[in-house]
């Protein structure tokens, strides 16, 4: 479905958005191997996920005519201290709006915010095959850095996972401390959301 891009609104998610976001995620769980979850999470569990991510990282939604039609978020990919400059990205869009560039816009916003947080590397774990996701990551200049064959089992088949990586800043000799998303200047965040 084509949409009027000037009517798109990008903003930070809130816990109150959980049920609407879950409506987008549900078909990915129930009908695809794009996510390795077997069961659709409850609204309460999803609220908790949003709350936890927003403690440190961005969780962005795209609204169109008062409906959430896409979302993207980042989170810490590994727990050891030396990995703190790395983040994993995820993006999901309502299938009815595929081909409108929503995923690209969400990713662009996410990456710009992560730069302000002093994140250096971003990663995406993409089930194989997933042509649309591969195109998205190629568009942003991600490199394929690993392929794990048969690493997940869903719907009676084994599925591989491709790891994509992108450096979003230089590799400083002494990296700056990571900032929580709440520590970023609100004016700068507003400008990024309106890119």
PLM regions: where:
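Conserved GNAT acetyl-CoA-binding A-motif
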Residues: 114-126
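Active-site acidic-Proline motif in GNAT/NAT acetyltransferases
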Residues: 91-96, 100, 112, 128-129
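Conserved GNAT-fold acetyl-CoA-binding loop/helix
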Residues: 22, 26-49
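A short beta-loop-alpha structural element at the N-terminal edge
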Residues: 9-21
């Amino acid at each position: 479905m084509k949409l009027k891009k000037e009517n798109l609104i990008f903003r930070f998610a809130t816990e109150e958005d959980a049920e609407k976001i879950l409506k987008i995620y549900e078909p990915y769980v129930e009908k695809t191997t794009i996510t390795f979850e077997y069961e659709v999470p409850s609204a309460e569990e999803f609220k908790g996920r949003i709350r936890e991510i927003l403690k440190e990282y961005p969780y962005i939604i795209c609204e169109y005519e008062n409906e959430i039609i896409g979302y993207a978020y980042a989170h810490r990919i590994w727990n050891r201290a030396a990995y703190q400059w790395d983040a994993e990205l995820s993006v999901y869009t309502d299938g009815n709006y595929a081909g409108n560039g929503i995923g690209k816009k969400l990713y662009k916003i996410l990456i710009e915010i992560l730069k302000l947080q002093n994140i250096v590397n971003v990663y995406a774990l993409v089930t194989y095959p997933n042509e649309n996701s591969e195109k998205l990551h190629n568009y942003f200049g991600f490199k394929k850095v690993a392929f794990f064959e048969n690493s997940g089992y869903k719907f009676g088949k084994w599925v591989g996972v491709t790891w994509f990586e992108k450096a979003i800043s230089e590799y400083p000799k002494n990296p700056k401390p990571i900032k929580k998303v709440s520590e970023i200047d609100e004016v700068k965040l507003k400008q990024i959301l309106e890119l």
